[in-house]
């Protein structure tokens, strides 16, 4: 009966040197015959092989100078103690046929350890496969979540049902973009005062024109020729304060949070843009505003009235306010009523029951603020600067920080 095929735990590796010419069968025969009965029937090599406790004995043989050398491999399914005993047993061989012989065990390999190493290496490959192809990246999940939340926050604004962020009405300033995807991307990254043109094939929506009369407007265009065309059409009918542009070749909907922030931080005024177009040799068309929408010249608004008498050093107050992005509300006795962020000023003017005489703000005074202030009877507004103003009450003075510092 031949040896059974076994799943070996260990591999005994030994070398034998025979002082004569022999073949494989001689060596294998010597292993069985010379070890028979030495350690009892339970450790007899033939019995162990028949029971599947050791596997087929392999012998790799070569001769040189009349001597025979061979490497012996014996797979073992015994425990480590019994395997060591078998290894010691075969070292007891002294002859092969008529020739003296010597056997030396070179190593006992733990095949399970080798298998474990292979399993671990394979597991590493599979984990990498899972990470690369199966499990989504955490950043991707967060980006998808942000996008889903942004889409849920998008509203339809005006009779044209333009895609817009939820703060278009609340904010003193708006960002105008081309399409819905641009709105989604900006809202996703925290810019909620954004509204889309939704194309200009049918002209600039009237809603955009009306918003531009009363809010500070930044137009955020794609970094291609199409963005330039959209801007030119918009400038024909709407008031624009600033222009921001995506990096060359990129669209607003593709930008990352850092790219959006950088583009908006580097926005330029309309005047700067027109100067750039002129310098580049392009004939930029200066927007022609319809007569009813023409802003009242700021020079007239600011300088017709005499500078009011302030009960404190206004230059010091301006220096104190600069950089705070806050507004201070005063009554007719110049008593401070409230100090609040500029972004909360419109809501305060709408809901407050306090008597208001003057406002000092480190921000932009828009037409909306002027209208709300007029309803509250405000007589003086001191501001960092102004947006386009189409109507200022005769009994209201609007003075900028720069003007007051020059006077001082």
From Swiss-Prot:
Q: Which Gene3D superfamilies match?
A: 3.40.1360.10
GO function terms (MF aspect): DNA-directed RNA polymerase activity; metal ion binding; poly(A) binding
Annotated Mg(2+) 2 binding lies at 222, 224
Q: Which EC number(s) are documented for this chain?
A: 2.7.7.101
Keyword match Nucleotidyltransferase: yes
The UniProt entry, under SMART domains, shows: TOPRIM
**Record keyword Hydrolase present:** no
Q: Please name the top-level EC class of this enzyme.
A: transferase
Per its UniProt record, what SUPFAM superfamilies does this chain match?
DNA primase core
What cofactors are annotated for this protein? Mg(2+)
Name the reaction it catalyses: ssDNA + n NTP = ssDNA/pppN(pN)n-1 hybrid + (n-1) diphosphate
- Sorted alphabetically, which Pfam families does this protein's record hold? Toprim_4
Q: So where does Mg(2+) 1 get bound?
A: 178, 222
Q: List this protein's GO terms for biological process.
A: DNA replication, synthesis of primer
- Residues forming the Toprim domain are 172-248
Write out the ranges of the annotated region (Disordered).
279-304
UniProt keyword annotations, A-Z = DNA replication, DNA-directed RNA polymerase, Exosome, Magnesium, Metal-binding, Nucleotidyltransferase, Primosome, Transcription, Transferase
Q: What is the cofactor note?
A: Binds two Mg(2+) per subunit.
Share what the entry says about its subunit structure, partners included.
Forms a ternary complex with MCM helicase and DNA. Component of the archaeal exosome complex.
What's its job? RNA polymerase that catalyzes the synthesis of short RNA molecules used as primers for DNA polymerase during DNA replication. Also part of the exosome, which is a complex involved in RNA degradation. Acts as a poly(A)-binding protein that enhances the interaction between heteromeric, adenine-rich transcripts and the exosome.
* Protein name in the entry: DNA primase DnaG
Q: What is the protein's species of origin?
A: Pyrobaculum aerophilum (strain ATCC 51768 / DSM 7523 / JCM 9630 / CIP 104966 / NBRC 100827 / IM2)
């Amino acid at each position: 009966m031949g040896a059974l095929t076994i799943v070996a735990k260990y591999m005994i590796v030994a070398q034998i040197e025979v002082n004569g010419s022999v073949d494989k069968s001689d060596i294998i025969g010597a292993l069985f015959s010379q070890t028979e009965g030495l350690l009892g029937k339970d450790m007899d090599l033939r019995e162990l092989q028949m029971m599947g406790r050791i596997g087929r004995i392999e012998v790799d043989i070569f001769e040189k100078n009349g001597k025979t050398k061979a490497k012996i491999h014996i797979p073992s399914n015994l425990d480590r103690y019994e395997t060591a005993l078998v290894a010691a047993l075969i070292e007891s061989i002294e002859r092969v046929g008529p020739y003296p012989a010597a056997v030396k065990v070179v190593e006992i390999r733990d095949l399970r350890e080798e298998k474990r190493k292979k399993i671990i290496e394979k597991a590493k490959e599979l984990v990498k496969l899972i990470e690369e192809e199966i499990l989504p990246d955490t950043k991707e999940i967060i980006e998808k979540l942000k996008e889903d939340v942004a889409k849920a926050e998008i509203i339809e604004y005006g009779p044209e049902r333009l895609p817009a962020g939820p703060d278009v009405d609340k904010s003193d300033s708006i960002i105008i973009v081309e399409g819905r995807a641009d709105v989604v991307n900006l809202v996703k990254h925290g810019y909620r005062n954004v509204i889309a043109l939704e194309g200009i094939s049918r002209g600039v929506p009237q809603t955009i024109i009306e918003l531009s009369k009363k809010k500070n407007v930044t137009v955020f265009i794609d970094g291609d020729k199409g963005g330039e065309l959209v801007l030119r059409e918009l400038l024909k009918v709407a008031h624009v304060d600033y222009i921001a542009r995506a990096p060359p070749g990129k669209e607003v909907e593709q930008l990352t949070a850092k790219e959006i922030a950088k583009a908006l931080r580097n926005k330029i005024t309309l005047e700067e843009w027109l100067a750039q177009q002129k310098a580049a040799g392009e004939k930029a068309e200066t927007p022609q505003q319809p007569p009813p929408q023409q802003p009242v010249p700021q020079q007239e608004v600011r300088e017709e009235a005499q500078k009011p008498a302030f009960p404190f050093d206004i230059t010091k107050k301006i220096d104190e306010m600069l950089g705070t992005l806050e507004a201070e509300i005063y009554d007719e006795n110049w008593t401070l009523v409230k100090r609040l962020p500029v972004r909360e000023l419109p809501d305060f003017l709408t809901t407050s029951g306090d008597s208001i005489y003057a406002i000092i703000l480190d921000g932009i005074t828009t037409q909306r603020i002027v209208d709300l202030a007029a309803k509250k009877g405000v007589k003086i507004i001191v501001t960092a600067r102004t947006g386009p103003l189409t109507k200022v009450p005769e009994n209201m003075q609007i003075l900028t920080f720069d003007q007051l510092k020059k006077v001082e």
